[in-house]
Amino acid sequence: MTLRHQIIALAIVPLVISILAITTFITWQSANLAKNSIDTFEQNMLKTKEAEILNLTNLALSAIQTIYDKAGSDDEAAKQQVAAILTSLDYGKDGYFFVYDYDGNNIVHPRQSFRHGHNWLDLTDPDGDKVIAELIATAKAGGGLHQYKWQKPSTGQIADKLSFVVSLDKWHWVVGTGVYLDDVFAQSAAANAGMRANIKRTFVIVALIDVPSVLVVFTTCMLLTFHERRMADSRLKALTQRVIDTQEEERARLARELHDGISQNLVGVRYAMDLAGRKVRTNVDDAALTIDRGVEALNGAIKEIRRLSHDLRPRVLDDLGLTAALEALCYHFAERTGIETKIDASGFTDTLKAEANTALYRVAQEAFNNVERHAGASKLAVKLWSDNGRARMTVSDNGAGFDGIKDGMSGRSGLGLRNMQERMAHFRGLLLINSSEAGTTLTAMMPKSANRPVNRQAEAA
């Protein structure tokens, strides 16, 4: 991590940590306070319900007390009279009294008449609670509350119910009534939803205050970093271009020396040996054959030197322009490799600076080298054209293609691609590579800024 990154981290990290800590504490405190309030509210509601059903049970017992006290244990008439009274005690759609005997047989149930006369001792609710058995046990133990799930008459849905039961021990009866708790839970859920909304609102307010602060600090640091990086990139590109210019100058110098010095000398040697061969041929056949071979070798050396000279700096690029240089490059490439090579430059108008022409030529040259070494192609096509004053060039082959990340940016091929990209980047141009199993297409795009000034274009014309 660089010093600047460390400074940015020291500026942002403590701020982010403090914001997260404050937000977490506020959220936790709000959640605890709301939870405690909701729990208290729910407990108060349950206590109110408990008091309500206790009072209702006492009223029912008062209504049957006289009959029950006077009746015997087997007084069927009294039992029927008490059952009728309890059936008639109705308070709302979901308010009623029920009666079971100790064996689990239903005696009174105004809302579910199908239960009358049947044994429900083994009845269980969705939670697995043996409802009737538990109610009987609670009543035998002296009476009390029991919570379970039961069908709510007004909706037909299963809901939580809280019942209070007492026993009429002389008759072995269990008398009870209850209230449904879904309204309590609904109010608790609404309060809980309100609590979550308040916490979310608090979190949003904190975020609206703190996030911009972090963004301002981060943006300021990043702007400074990007500014310095842009300056460093500019300096690096300038240095890279100076290196490229130096290389071009050295190549041009070497090309001149090879062409004007060594090549001319070798041509002289060839003519001298040719003359010697003609003089010797009349007398000594072996000497003539040896000289002919020497001439052939010298011809090969001359051809190789000229090829090297062309690779280093083709004079045709300076003398005849980019189109002619690319045509010569295609011709020599096809002759050397046997790959069918075509060029189409019919739509190109040469308005580029000399340096831009060199850059496009070197891009094509490097692309040809990659095709020869790696692609295994049988066809190669070059297209050069102008689009609204912007030079464009594509180099396409039908080779194997490559993965631009794994293959194209590794080894010598990767260095070549980087060199091509740097050459284009110097002129603010683009280098696009589209590679697949069907082949590779390389597109070089020069901006208008790479063109010669208008007055120089007129002079060139």
Curated annotation (Swiss-Prot):
GO molecular function, one term: ATP binding
EC number: 2.7.13.3
Keyword DNA damage set for record: no
Reactions catalysed, as given in the entry: ATP + protein L-histidine = ADP + protein N-phospho-L-histidine
Parts of the chain that traverse the membrane: 7-27, 203-223
Modification type Phosphohistidine: residues: H259
Pfam families: HATPase_c (PF02518), HisKA_3 (PF07730), sCache_2 (PF17200)
Domain Histidine kinase, residue spans: 360-450
Intracellular or extracellular location(s): Cell membrane
Annotated keywords: ATP-binding, Cell membrane, Kinase, Membrane, Nucleotide-binding, Phosphoprotein, Plasmid, Transferase, Transmembrane, Transmembrane helix, Two-component regulatory system
GO cellular component: plasma membrane
Tagged with keyword Cytoplasm: no
Gene3D superfamilies named among the record's database cross-references: 1.20.5.1930, Histidine kinase-like ATPase, C-terminal domain, PAS domain
InterPro entries tied to this protein: HATPase_C_sf (IPR036890), sCache_2 (IPR033480), Sensor_HK_TwoCompSys (IPR050482), Sig_transdc_His_kin_sub3_dim/P (IPR011712), Sig_transdc_His_kinase_MctS (IPR017171)
EC class name: transferase
Main function: Member of the two-component regulatory system MctS/MctR, which activates mctP expression.
Protein name: Sensor histidine kinase MctS
Originating species: Rhizobium johnstonii (strain DSM 114642 / LMG 32736 / 3841)
Protein encoded by which gene: mctS
